[in-house]
Regions:
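Short, Lys/Arg-enriched N-terminal segments with co-localized hydrophobic residues
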Residues: 2-15
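Divalent metal-coordination and catalytic microenvironments
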Residues: 27, 76, 198, 273
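Glycine/charged-rich beta-loop-alpha catalytic/anionic-binding loops adjacent to active sites
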Residues: 16-19, 181-192, 226-227, 251-257
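N-terminal loops that bind phosphate or other acidic moieties
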Residues: 18-38, 42, 46, 150-152, ...
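Glycine-rich nucleotide/cofactor/substrate-binding loop typically near the N-terminus or early
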Residues: 39-181, 241, 250-255, 261, ...
Length: 312
């Protein structure tokens, strides 16, 4: 079942603004963030309307539950009808020998030292069935897109003006970072992986789910990133990739590198954090009113805590 929790108030108690603590100790990507927002209670109707209104075909979305190290969390996946669309979520393409073997079991196995991405199995949804937002593919060719093509797609989506503004902001952050990385004018940047269909869906879903929760403050103490290399259409790049480095540098987001190999923080995830962050400092104490757990492709999770209570 989808769950939605309104802020509300009790008699004699003033309703407080919601605050979100974004714990990125396991990194952040677009799908992890969306899953966590859904787990917190994002409006399912708003998400459905937004996804149905994206002016393109060839994708569907699955929302379900998976276990990471034995912990139940939400899983958000964008599936493409055309397998050749891109390699954003193709772990064998991205990491080569770092990726799990085909047919490997799901990530519910207790393997704390495991670095491989978990398999692409999909567990059943909240009510025992997988949730789908289906779109029939009309054209197997999806060209790489620039901001000139992406921003009108966002404007055409059925979501609030606030959500549209956030989605545009996220893509502009990514575009500026890519422009700097490739020494190109912003209007000449074409988004390869980031501009591919699944990433557009991730950004629209991130904007609409976050907007539906009416969060006023977002605390992002740091982003935890891996090391090593990752493969993309430009070749093999160091982790963190240049676009991610440019985002955390421009928006002064603290970053911590771990010894684990692989990309924990994607440019889309970094851009989402940059777009919504209002602070990097947690209060000395606080009351946790609800937690949302979003599953990524690896065998760890991104935890997000939100509080609409006053700091203590």
């Amino acid at each position: 079942m989808w769950r939605h929790r309104s802020t509300g108030w009790r008699k004699g108690v003033k309703a407080m603004d919601k605050k979100l603590y974004l714990d990125c100790g396991s990194g952040i990507s677009g799908d992890m963030f969306v899953a966590a927002m859904i787990d917190l209670g994002a409006d399912p109707d708003a998400l459905q309307k937004a996804l149905d209104s994206i002016p393109t075909d060839g994708f569907f979305v699955e929302i379900g539950r998976v276990k990471k190290s034995g912990i139940d969390c939400c899983d958000f996946r964008v599936r493409l009808d055309d397998d050749c669309e891109n390699h954003d979520h193709d772990m064998d393409y991205l990491y080569g020998s770092l990726a799990p073997a085909a047919g490997s079991g799901c990530s519910c196995h207790e393997e704390p030292d495991r670095e491989e991405h978990h398999c692409h199995c999909h567990e059943e949804g909240y009510d025992g069935e997988a949730h789908h937002c289906c779109r029939q593919e009309k054209d197997h060719h999806h060209p790489h897109r620039g901001l000139a093509e992406i921003l009108p797609m966002i404007d055409a989506c059925d979501m609030t003006e606030t959500a549209k503004a956030l989605a545009r902001k996220i893509f502009r952050i990514i575009g500026e970072a890519e422009a700097k990385a490739h020494d190109l004018p912003l209007d000449e940047v074409h988004f390869h992986e980031v501009g591919a269909l699944d990433s557009i869906v991730d950004v629209v879903a991130a904007a609409v789910t976050f907007d539906s929760l009416h969060i006023k403050e977002v605390i992002v103490p740091k982003l935890t990133e891996g090391t090593g290399t990752v493969r993309c259409r430009h070749g093999v790049m160091p982790v963190p990739v240049p676009a991610t480095v440019n985002i955390v540098s421009a928006y002064k987001i603290p970053m911590e590198l771990t010894g684990a190999k692989g990309e924990y923080v994607t440019p889309t995830g970094a851009a989402i954090a940059a777009a919504i962050s209002t602070s990097h400092q947690l209060p000395p104490s606080f009351v946790i009113k609800k937690a949302g757990l979003g599953a990524g492709k690896r065998a760890y999770t991104c935890l997000l805590y939100t509080s609409d209570a006053a700091d203590e």
